[in-house]
Amino acid sequence: MEPVKQVIKLTPFLILCIQIAYCWYDLLTVEDSFITIKYYLALSLLIINIGIYFWKFEKGLIITGIILLLSTFSLIYITFEVATNSFYIQFGSLKISTPDIHGFSLLVLIGYCIVNYDIIKMFRAKLALILKKL
């Protein structure tokens, strides 16, 4: 793969690294901050992802997408202040709501999907073959 294409494909990962570094800077310098397991999980997944990038580039890209997906649904935190939105549909007294969605992570995830569409398409085809064998 060309170096320019690799840098473009790495852009969401670099945004993720910068955001988590800034988040941990805020967590460690602000007095009233409370570090939860979701912050530790995000940091550990990022460190594992860095190692995977050195081992296999395409797998690192897939793991970056998984981290962004987890962050979008607030299962891990990559920002200091976590603001989420949730929408719902109401049928009489029944309320059906979406999971909490983190806007910044969703924006980076959309950019990731646009830049890495070919990798996602290839991963989807491999996953379909694996599931077909089962």
Spell out what each predicted region is.
Residues 5-10, 103-130:
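Membrane-water interface at the C-terminal end of transmembrane alpha helices
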Residues 1-43:
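N-terminal signal-anchor transmembrane alpha-helix
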